[in-house]
Design a protein with these regions (language model features):
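C-terminal tail/sorting-segment detector
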Residues: 227-229, 233-257
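Beta-strand-rich modules
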Residues: 90-112
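Beta-strand-rich extracellular modules
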Residues: 104-108, 224, 239-243
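Exoplasmic/lumenal beta-rich domain surfaces
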Residues: 22-24, 29-92, 146-149, 157, ...
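Conserved aromatic anchor
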Residues: 2-22, 170
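Short, conserved beta-strand segments of beta-strand-rich sandwich/propeller modules, principally
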Residues: 27, 98-102, 167, 232-237
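Extracellular fibronectin type III
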Residues: 108-139, 248
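Glycine-centered coil/turn sites that cap beta-strands in beta-rich domains
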Residues: 140-180
């Protein structure tokens, strides 16, 4: 099982309520959901609720999510030219599944004005994540590449309808690699070019327009051959070549239909 680390900024804490014109921020809620079979989206579950230490709510404080420096003081982390102040780790989640996450902020409300607490929409900053193994860096490719699910028994639970909505994953890949798939007779079935920035654009079962975040060391395959045919049942062999070092590793997987 893998984990997803969610980072976010503290801008909501200085937001002025449009009605009261006061900075009445109270806390954050983190939600998660997993894509189920045939493109259904499960209900969002509340993973964490955390709020200021005052006379409202649970008074948890932010110490469990705040990014701190070596001296224990509040700090930030720079990721892709953006500074983030908080993080939350969702552990023990299954690799290869599409997960949805959202961070919302909510205010204190105003009992005197008969106003309930307001919360930002879970859809305003929703992100799409495929947990998995990070890419092996140059000259640091440890272990063997593998395939999951293996064996592939007709359909994985994350598959949609139709032969082009099936999907399995190659795992433990270098940051730049070429995957070659062969039949047991030695016939070349498909060639896949992998880069660490892979976003699933070559797979019908992955909506790349939603900019899904991936670990970098995994690549999906739709079980369609290079001749645009569905693969048959059988044992398949594959090689993975590290494009930087030239190192080649081998593996095999079974398709049962």
């Amino acid at each position: 099982s893998g984990k997803v680390t969610i980072y976010w900024q503290d801008g909501a804490e200085s937001f002025l309520d449009p009605i009261s014109q006061e900075a009445d921020f109270e806390g954050y809620r983190i939600y998660g959901a997993r894509k189920t079979a045939n493109d259904d989206l499960g209900e969002f579950s509340l993973l964490l609720e955390i709020d200021l230490k005052n006379d409202i709510g649970y008074n948890t404080g932010f110490s469990t999510i705040r990014i701190i420096n070596e001296f224990g003081e509040p700090d930030s982390i720079l990721i892709n030219d953006t500074y983030y102040h908080y993080k939350f780790e969702n552990a023990n989640i299954k690799d290869g599944w599409l997960n949805y996450y959202a961070v919302t902020a909510y205010d204190q409300g105003d009992p005197d004005a008969n106003l309930e607490s307001l919360e930002s929409s879970i859809y305003s900053n929703r992100v799409y994540v495929f947990p998995g193994k990070a890419a092996a860096k140059e000259n640091d490719w440890v272990g063997e590449p593998t395939v999951y699910p293996n064996p592939f028994k007709g359909q994985a639970l994350w598959d949609g309808y139709g032969s082009r909505s099936k999907m399995l994953w190659f795992r433990n890949l270098p940051n730049e690699a070429e995957i070659r798939i062969f039949s047991l007779a030695g016939d070349l079935v498909d060639i896949i070019q992998h880069e660490e920035s892979y976003n699933g654009a070559d797979i019908a079962n992955i909506d790349a327009q939603k900019n899904p975040l991936m670990a970098g060391g995994e690549h999906a395959w739709d079980l369609i051959t290079m001749h645009d045919q569905a693969t048959a049942s059988g044992l398949y062999l594959f090689t993975v070549e590290d494009k930087n070092s030239g190192q080649i590793k081998e593996g095999k997987f079974l398709i049962i239909k």
